[in-house]
């Protein structure tokens, strides 16, 4: 684990000039709701796309499933930094929140940033230059950035001639 204890993440926060966010456990080493400006990341919905994806990626079994099997994520020893950028109330956000969360993740030493932002059909063409620049800064620091391109088919759905540079079109 990169952060062995709460003191390690607090030192990283101090070095990065970050005075917000909360340590929850050895697994969830940092959490902050950028939209609400609080440490409370509990979502109103019982099932959340971002939380679900996090479980697929970094889930490690605490209890056995009903069939007595244990379910693991693809990287069960990974530590998590939850950085929420969407409102729980109306599912809105702002590009400045994406940028701040990306920059903070890099400053705190993230190896991978997953942005579960998928919508019906979208692309980086729709992202503002500030978000694209933040992703480029992260990549320049060696951070892998993974962004959902859509959750409902390919970008090309509904477009007779989708842009060739959109890699999710097959």
Where are these regions (language model features)?
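Substrate-binding/access-modulating region of protease and related hydrolase catalytic domains
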Residues: 40, 60, 82-169
């Amino acid at each position: 684990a990169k952060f062995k204890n709460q003191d390690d993440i607090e030192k990283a926060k101090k070095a990065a000039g970050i005075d917000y966010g909360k340590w929850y456990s050895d697994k969830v080493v940092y959490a902050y709701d950028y939209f609400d400006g609080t440490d409370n990341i509990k979502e109103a919905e019982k099932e959340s796309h971002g939380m679900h994806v996090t479980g697929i990626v970094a889930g490690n079994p605490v209890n056995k499933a009903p069939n007595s099997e244990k379910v693991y994520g693809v990287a069960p020893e990974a530590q998590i930094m939850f950085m929420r950028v969407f409102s729980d109330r109306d599912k809105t956000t702002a590009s400045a929140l994406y940028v701040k969360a990306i920059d903070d993740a890099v400053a705190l030493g993230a190896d991978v940033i997953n942005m579960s932002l998928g919508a019906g059909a979208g692309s980086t063409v729709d992202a503002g230059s500030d978000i694209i620049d933040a992703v480029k800064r992260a990549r320049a620091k060696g951070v892998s950035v993974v962004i959902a391109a859509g959750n409902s088919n390919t970008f090309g759905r509904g477009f007779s001639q989708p842009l060739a540079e959109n890699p999710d079109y097959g």
